[in-house]
Amino acid sequence: MSLEERVMELESRMAFQDDTIQALNDVLVKQRRELDHLQLQMAAMLKRQEEMGSQFETFEEDAPPPHY
């Protein structure tokens, strides 16, 4: 294999690696956006659960004992 062929082979491999790296980066960016969105949803659900939990606690305090 001549030097020119070796250089062409290396350039070809580098181009494929660049494409792979870009594809992986695109997936990583998409996953990061999805993770950020899921974290916001989780925070909203936790807040809602806390609000609903305090509503149920007041109902339980006002309820008569089970033997009535």
Curated annotation (Swiss-Prot):
InterPro entries recorded: SlyX (IPR007236)
Pfam families, alphabetized: SlyX
Transmembrane segments: none
Superkingdom assignment: Bacteria
Xref: NCBIfam families: PRK00295.1
Protein family according to the UniProt entry: Belongs to the SlyX family.
Stored PANTHER family: PROTEIN SLYX
Full protein name: Protein SlyX homolog
Protein species of origin: Pseudomonas syringae pv. syringae (strain B728a)
